[in-house]
Amino acid sequence: ITSAWSSHGDQRLMEYCNSSRDYGTRISEEQFDQAFDQWIADQTPGINFGKDIKCLITIHANLSYLSASVPNGETFELEHIIARKRIDAADSSRPRHILGNSLGNCMYLPRGINNPKKDKTLYEINDHNRYSQLIKESQYFSEDEMQKAMQALTASDYESVNGLLRERS
């Protein structure tokens, strides 16, 4: 995520082959946090999830909420937590202002949940607490956070929406 390999692939590979760098050398948690925070800060507004986001959300989902609570064999889809339709309605300008393509706005949902959900939140379709466990295990926005995000969208308060998305990331 630090783009250490971009445009220096062969040179960088030689550094590892000659042992001036080593994949086996652990970085500190602080170094990782700094690199991750910088990567989050460098995100640009948009709506389509990039390869890096898809990769990270797949790893997270498989190590957390998908591994324990969702049946095997189920088909999954990437989902915009703040629905794409709602983001498009609030931010249709170019360039975009909302980080709809961010890690904080992405999760996997089983197709059976995602298709009927459309532009709603999981809270809006959570009849009889049907999705409460998924909401908890996926680190979905709290109801209060989701309400703040919807109010900020309505008010075109892009910074507040982006702040919530960055925080969830």
What are these regions (language model features)?
Residues 120-125:
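Short cysteine/histidine-rich zinc-coordinating motifs and their immediately flanking basic loops
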Residues 3, 55, 65, 101, ...:
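Intrinsically disordered, low-complexity segments used for protein-protein interactions
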Residues 18, 48, 62, 72, ...:
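Detector for Asparagine
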Residues 1-81, 86-91, 108:
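Intrinsically disordered, low-complexity N-proximal targeting/linker segments that flank membranes
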Residues 76, 89-115:
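Short beta-strand-alpha-helix junction that forms the catalytic/metal-binding core
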Residues 84-86, 116-119:
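Flexible loop/turn segments at secondary-structure boundaries
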Residues 77-79, 105, 114, 144, ...:
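Residue-level signal for functionally critical sites in structured catalytic/ligand-binding pockets
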Residues 127-169:
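C-terminal, well-folded lobe of enzymatic/effector domains
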